[in-house]
């Protein structure tokens, strides 16, 4: 389906080369300050137009808030946001019809929808559609701010180049002042060179990002079906190109003995907390007031300019294709912004589920 969430529900729509993409957000309380600038700020973070290899389409996001907002505040009714597609060049995809691109969703969509699916630009499976997710994430981040919570992410690996130096949450936020959100300047320089090299060779690279959520209240999540980690994993895998997820110290925990893996419980400001937080802020599927953090791994962009083997579905014969359209050398930076958004949406949904934020009455104005 195309809807995510329980109390805060988002429904996305549209295809890469259709007239528009968009999102309907239901469950936002009345009285939340929200402007077009709030949406634009997040959409602009997704662009990376200053690095041509990451966004050759570089489409300025022309959007409209169609409903649910009046005089700079939400009304408590569904918020509809439409984002217009302006720079699609569909002719690039004429020769690809009935020749599924390896690594793309083309084959799966053909098997499920037959000849009725829109293959242009990847259609519904395109990374372009994550712009709608990012727009919804802008609203969710405003909800998180009501309780003093914030979400931020950064790139930890790109094309085999890894960030190895230690860092803080403040370092993660400041990394967005750089060409790419990378806390290590040496790693950043190497990543930019990897992007340049692969663009010249007509290839692509994958990588990994890390998402942080700080200030999240304790008690969110359920013991079994509705665990906060399970819901966040569901959210993460809703973003195109995601192939794996590590929570907290992740696979490193699996290599430790129990005495090493356990986080000592200590008193922090008169309350119980964790001394080390290798577990990533969640125990038993429930938040405990510590920072949440997890890493998400993404495959390389399937569209490359190198010849690839496929099948001509009309003839059921082997075929070779070579993509000639525009493509991102790496989906990692744009996916990072979408993953931030899905994290914020999931946490805001849990805040509403738990009654931390109520929607049976207007929020105070101004919001505190």
From Swiss-Prot:
Amino acids binding NADP(+): 46
Domain of life: Archaea
EC number: 4.2.3.5
GO molecular function, one term: FMN binding
Reactions performed catalytically: 5-O-(1-carboxyvinyl)-3-phosphoshikimate = chorismate + phosphate
PROSITE patterns listed in its UniProt record: CHORISMATE_SYNTHASE_1, CHORISMATE_SYNTHASE_2
Pathway(s) per entry: Metabolic intermediate biosynthesis; chorismate biosynthesis; chorismate from D-erythrose 4-phosphate and phosphoenolpyruvate: step 7/7
Any single Gene Ontology cellular-component annotation: cytosol
Cofactor: FMNH2
Cofactor note: Reduced FMN (FMNH(2)).
GO biological process terms on file: amino acid biosynthetic process; aromatic amino acid family biosynthetic process; chorismate biosynthetic process
Ligand binding (FMN): 124-126, 284, 299-303, 326
EC supergroup of this enzyme: lyase
Keywords, comma-separated and alphabetical: Amino-acid biosynthesis, Aromatic amino acid biosynthesis, FAD, Flavoprotein, FMN, Lyase, NADP
Entry's family note: Belongs to the chorismate synthase family.
Function, as annotated: This reaction introduces a second double bond into the aromatic ring system.
Protein name: Chorismate synthase
Organism encoding this protein: Pyrobaculum arsenaticum (strain DSM 13514 / JCM 11321 / PZ6)
